[in-house]
């Protein structure tokens, strides 16, 4: 892989459904916190930067990662969405030119192998970005991948913004992206929050690229467990069955 890689890990959320006093990303899976698992996977990609976005109980998260000297932090004090979280990383990305891989701190089983394929999907096609997708039986809550007649991406639409026809789509956005750094810095400020949640969505960056006729590559994975997030204690217990 020719271009340098910077990794952004989104870890600022409260995780209300965990019903716990500690931040969601500090819950442990087989003895290792969720955020540490994502950092260790990122390291396997030989990335130049690992930027972790923190917010809720930020000092606790920061302290837990004190031994990870290669990790820098960006602060998202207000939870205004994933695009807003990435915007908080602009200072950390100063003078960086390459691919930015965006991960979630609560998706602990993603593998470096899958991420390498996603990066190659962008690099090999000359696309501005690549998006990880998957076909799942129960797509409730996930953003949908809407393709055009030729099979290319038309748009990504959040579940709450989908019409009845779009809700029947089973191909979902896994929330993992590779984006050219120049495009990231240019398009993040263009994102609005005219949606059901009133938030700044990262998928809208992808949609803006498509609207401007730039190529976005879709990489579909069959490793469904790898893209499973932790939003509750029940989901955490479920992932215990699959983790090493």
Predicted segment positions?
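N-terminal nucleotide-binding beta1-loop-alpha1 segment
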Residues: 1-20, 50
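Conserved core of the sugar-phosphate nucleotidyltransferase
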Residues: 69, 110-196, 205, 214, ...
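Short glycine-enriched, charge-decorated loop/helix-capping segments at active-site entrances
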Residues: 22-28, 191-194
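Conserved N-terminal catalytic core of the sugar/cofactor nucleotidyltransferase
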Residues: 2-3, 32-103, 109-113
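Residue-level signal for inorganic ion chemistry
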Residues: 9, 35, 50, 89, ...
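Left-handed beta-helix
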Residues: 1-4, 197-244
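Short aromatic/basic micro-patch
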Residues: 28, 109, 178, 229-230
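Structural beta-sheet core signal
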Residues: 7-9, 51-52, 101-102, 129-132, ...
């Amino acid at each position: 892989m020719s271009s340098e890689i910077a990794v952004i890990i989104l870890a600022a959320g409260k995780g209300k459904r965990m019903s716990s006093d500690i931040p969601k990303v500090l819950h442990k899976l087989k003895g290792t916190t969720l955020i540490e698992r994502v950092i260790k996977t990122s390291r396997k990609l030989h990335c130049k930067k690992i930027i972790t976005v923190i917010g809720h109980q930020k000092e606790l998260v920061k302290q837990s990662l004190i031994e990870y000297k290669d990790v820098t932090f960006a602060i998202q004090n207000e939870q205004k969405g994933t695009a807003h979280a990435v915007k908080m990383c602009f200072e950390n990305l100063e003078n960086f030119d390459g691919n930015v891989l965006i991960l979630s701190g609560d998706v602990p089983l993603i593998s470096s192998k899958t991420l390498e394929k996603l990066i190659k999907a962008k690099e090999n096609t000359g696309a501005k970005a690549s998006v990880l997708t998957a076909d799942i039986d129960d797509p409730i809550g996930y953003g949908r991948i809407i393709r055009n007649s030729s099979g290319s991406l038309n748009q990504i639409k959040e579940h709450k913004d989908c019409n009845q026809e779009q809700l029947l789509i089973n191909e979902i956005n896994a929330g993992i992206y590779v984006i050219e750094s120049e495009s990231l810095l240019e398009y993040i400020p263009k994102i609005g929050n005219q949606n059901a949640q009133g938030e700044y969505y990262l998928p809208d960056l992808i949609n803006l690229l498509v609207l401007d006729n730039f190529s976005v590559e879709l990489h579909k994975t069959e490793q469904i467990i790898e893209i499973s997030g932790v939003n509750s204690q029940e989901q955490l217990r479920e992932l215990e069955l699959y983790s090493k």
